[in-house]
Amino acid sequence: MKTYKVAVLAGDGIGPLVMKEALKILTFIAQKYNFSFEFNEAKIGGASIDAYGVALSDETLKLCEQSDAILFGSVGGPKWDNLPIDQRPERASLLPLRKHFNLFANLRPCKIYESLTHASPLKNEIIQKGVDILCVRELTGGIYFGKQDLGKESAYDTEIYTKKEIERIARIAFESARIRKKKVHLIDKANVLASSILWREVVANVAKDYQDINLEYMYVDNAAMQIVKNPSIFDVMLCSNLFGDILSDELAAINGSLGLLSSASLNDKGFGLYEPAGGSAPDIAHLNIANPIAQILSAALMLKYSFKEEQAAQDIENAISLALAQGKMTKDLNAKSYLNTDEMGDCILEILKENDNG
């Protein structure tokens, strides 16, 4: 029996609450598919600052190094806002983990469920065409990491990308498209940026190894418009760091709730950090009303990308779709009639059990 070692870093705010539901789902999935998990929990973020004086301890980092993947909750809160910026939970835990494990690829899915069209700001006639997008963003290069200078009369930032950096993120996008709808849009600004011209050259070359995938190009300004005007045309969106940062937040806005947004950050060895895209929401941390779906979907991404358990991941996604279709929702999705955090997790678990043919 295969055993997957997972570093469980629940963190602060709603993190521990929603993490509990994700682990509940994973435990059942492991039984169904005849593998096992070794969950090793550790403090991260503000909880780690309170316990050890630092947001990411050496012990926690070592635990992550000994694991096959990291399942991350959320960090931060007003309690630690008085600390210097570089010591606060968000800056001093997540960023060092990304750097240490060279997590260069960020994957952000955006799916609008038929039962949640009321939560999206988009018109029904747009949503009804189907919205299921994966934004693949390069995370460790580009303008955020280039040479910069802020002077009295002028300032500059430099965007530098190497062929190697572009090729490895492109392959992540094409491999992702193979288990989706087999289409990749490269989002760039090749009409004015030299770096975007290089992106086109490298991605076109990589595409030769993926003859089954349809590659299209789109300028970033047009892409920003099409996301709200005609999002059904997209499957996988491949973006540089800057463009991916902006467009993934736009995708979050059309989704309807941060409680539905999962993400994965991967390196070239298949190791990944999986986390909800929303924050720690300290204001509702003790109310048992947080939406656990983003955390559960992050666990499904872990199954899919780090452990290659695609069918197990699909089971979880299907169960969530069915629960929502049955009108089972948390307060962020339906303030008039809603389930608590643990009730939502139980509902998804029961659907998984009902559909268990094993």
Curated annotation (Swiss-Prot):
GO terms for biological process: L-leucine biosynthetic process. The keyword NAD applies. Gene3D superfamilies: Isopropylmalate Dehydrogenase. NAD(+) binds at residues 77-90, 279-291. GO terms for cellular component: cytosol. It catalyses: (2R,3S)-3-isopropylmalate + NAD(+) = 4-methyl-2-oxopentanoate + CO2 + NADH. Substrate binds at residues 98, 108, 137, 221. The record marks 144, 189 as: Important for catalysis. Keywords: Amino-acid biosynthesis, Branched-chain amino acid biosynthesis, Cytoplasm, Leucine biosynthesis, Magnesium, Manganese, Metal-binding, NAD, Oxidoreductase. GO terms for molecular function: 3-isopropylmalate dehydrogenase activity; magnesium ion binding; NAD binding. Pfam families: Iso_dh. Its EC number is 1.1.1.85. InterPro entries: IsoCit/isopropylmalate_DH_CS, IsoPropMal-DH-like_dom, Isopropylmalate_DH. Mg(2+) binds at residues 221, 245, 249. Its cofactor is Mg(2+); Mn(2+). Belongs to the isocitrate and isopropylmalate dehydrogenases family. LeuB type 1 subfamily. Homodimer. This is 3-isopropylmalate dehydrogenase. It comes from Campylobacter jejuni subsp. jejuni serotype O:2 (strain ATCC 700819 / NCTC 11168).
